[in-house]
Amino acid sequence: MDMAILPAGVWGTALAVPASAAGRRVRLWRRTPGWAESWDRGHPVLPGLKLPENVVACDSAQAAVSDADLVILSPAGAGLRPVCRLVRPHLRPDAVIVCATKSIEPETHLLVHQVVEEELPGHRGRIVALSGPNFAHEVAAGLPTGAVAACPDLSLADWVQQALMTDRFRVYTNPDLVGVELAGALKNVIALGAGISDGLGMGDNARAALITRGLVEMARLGRAMGANPLTFAGLAGMGDLVLSCTGDSSRNRRAGLAIGRGQSAEAFLAETGLTVEGITTARAGWQLAQRLGVRMPITEAIYQVLYEGLPPLTAMERLMARPRAHELEEVAGADLKPPFDP
């Protein structure tokens, strides 16, 4: 099987590790001119990585994808449409597109696979999402990792599972494409909130409550969009959420910590140069919730901190002062409306 991964950023390069270990022929592409000639079979952010001979670098997107059976798109959310447009003239008609990006498009509120469908209409129905609790540096180091390949056509999800699965990179399948993509995007927002809570010194109890109630509102929006609520209890939901809310390598958690300690989001981004998907997804998620009439108080609070100048401490105090509520909600099929009087 021939596989292409674009771009060869940190995440794309890391994915070449299980792909090559599974015996696939992998072509990497990066926009930097001349990078293929100087490539050292690794990535500067992944120290010690040396990819094997079945991974090659390409200077053009055409060279990377023209013979590929499977094409993994791994840009940041803002780069998804440009990468799709770049590869569109060169894709094989039968190529399977794997989306490894976790975002919601800010202007349109489209999920990743919906953006790809617009840009690559000839591949509609041949799009698979790859998601889960995956820090790139751990995948690159060959540490044990679980992931999810999601597609309504389970035969395609199975095919991607087979293409990437190794004894260190375990891939599960799920037909719920919407749920898996939405979970991967929304967990970035909740991870920002967890970082803010920790930055304020709110403690472990508060973080645990925020993670759990954040999962509830993620599933609540998912259900309104036709997703299976149980997806949010799996690797793409709870798994990725726990990792992003607690792992020190989480960009969203790091940004939240800085905001909780008094730094603005703009200053954090300027200082670090990082892409923090949760900052743009907070607005898109909140706007989606408004449009669909879904209650997402944690997402709303984070949106207000980022875009309306609400002090982080005030946001946390407001969340704790909300009316009494039942824990079992419509996500679990219960018909209990807060406030609940015992």
UniProtKB/Swiss-Prot annotation:
A Pfam family assignment: NAD_Gly3P_dh_C
A biological process from GO: glycerol-3-phosphate catabolic process
Superkingdom of origin organism: Bacteria
GO MF annotation, one: NAD binding
Catalytic activity: sn-glycerol 3-phosphate + NAD(+) = dihydroxyacetone phosphate + NADH + H(+); sn-glycerol 3-phosphate + NADP(+) = dihydroxyacetone phosphate + NADPH + H(+)
EC number: 1.1.1.94
Residues that bind sn-glycerol 3-phosphate: 102, 132, 187, 240, 250-252
Entry protein name: Glycerol-3-phosphate dehydrogenase [NAD(P)+]
Organism (species): Symbiobacterium thermophilum (strain DSM 24528 / JCM 14929 / IAM 14863 / T)
Gene transcribed to yield this protein: gpsA
